[in-house]
């Protein structure tokens, strides 16, 4: 009487082992996908999150450049655009050696007074570019010019996203 049941019990045990192996493979794939998503998220954060604010009084760009010093950054205005470039040579970090470079370009609103632009870098690596908006009827000047980056000793007061 045990003969007919023995093979079916072995097949059920083999199927249960195969199902457990498939579940373990799916869990390993989900863990690998979560690690890849965290790595991608870290890369996005390190790429320089920016925020642009504009109202009737001022135009403001906030850019996370924590991996760069003021000497690594150039900010210039060309016609109606602000161009921000950051580059540092290869240096050692926790994982080996890395060099970074980025280019950002933003259109200035037509009412921004380009003769009164400022740019500063906070102690926590937040670059703040600011331009006052001119009142209607006044003419905003438009030409190419470099905007120096000054260093602030205090952290940025901008809310982090």
From Swiss-Prot:
Residues bound to Zn(2+) 2: 95
UniProt key word Transmembrane helix: no
Pfam families: HSP20 (PF00011)
Glycan attachment points: 150
Ranges where the record places region Disordered: 140-161
Modified residue annotations for Deamidated glutamine: 38, 135
GO molecular function: metal ion binding; structural constituent of eye lens; unfolded protein binding
InterPro entries hit by this protein: A-crystallin/Hsp20_dom, Alpha-crystallin/sHSP_animal, HSP20-like_chaperone
Deamidated asparagine found at: 89, 111
Biased composition (Basic and acidic residues): 141-155
Location of Phosphoserine modifications: 110
Residues binding Zn(2+) 1, per UniProt: 88, 90
Keyword tRNA processing: no
Binding locations of Zn(2+) 3: 142
Oligomeric form and interacting partners: Heteromer composed of three CRYAA and one CRYAB subunits. Inter-subunit bridging via zinc ions enhances stability, which is crucial as there is no protein turn over in the lens. Can also form homodimers and homotetramers (dimers of dimers) which serve as the building blocks of homooligomers. Within homooligomers, the zinc-binding motif is created from residues of 3 different molecules. His-88 and Glu-90 from one molecule are ligands of the zinc ion, and His-95 and His-142 residues from additional molecules complete the site with tetrahedral coordination geometry.
Function comment: Contributes to the transparency and refractive index of the lens. In its oxidized form (absence of intramolecular disulfide bond), acts as a chaperone, preventing aggregation of various proteins under a wide range of stress conditions. Required for the correct formation of lens intermediate filaments as part of a complex composed of BFSP1, BFSP2 and CRYAA.
Protein name: Alpha-crystallin A chain
Organism expressing this protein natively: Galegeeska rufescens (East African rufous sengi)
Gene responsible for this protein: CRYAA
């Amino acid at each position: 009487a045990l003969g007919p049941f023995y093979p079916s019990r072995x097949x059920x045990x083999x199927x249960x082992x195969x199902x457990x192996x498939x579940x373990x493979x799916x869990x390993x794939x989900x863990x690998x996908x979560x690690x890849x998503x965290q790595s991608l998220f870290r890369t996005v954060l390190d790429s320089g999150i920016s925020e642009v604010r504009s109202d009737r009084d001022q135009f403001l760009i906030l850019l996370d450049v924590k991996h760069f010093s003021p000497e690594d950054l150039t900010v210039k205005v060309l016609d109606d655009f602000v161009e921000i470039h950051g580059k540092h040579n290869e240096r050692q970090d926790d994982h080996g050696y890395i060099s970074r470079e980025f280019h950002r370009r933003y259109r200035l609103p037509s009412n921004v007074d380009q003769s009164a632009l400022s740019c500063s870098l906070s102690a926590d690596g937040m670059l703040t570019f600011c331009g006052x908006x001119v009142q209607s009827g006044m003419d905003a000047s438009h030409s190419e010019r470099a905007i120096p980056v000054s260093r602030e000793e205090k952290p940025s007061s901008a809310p982090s996203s």
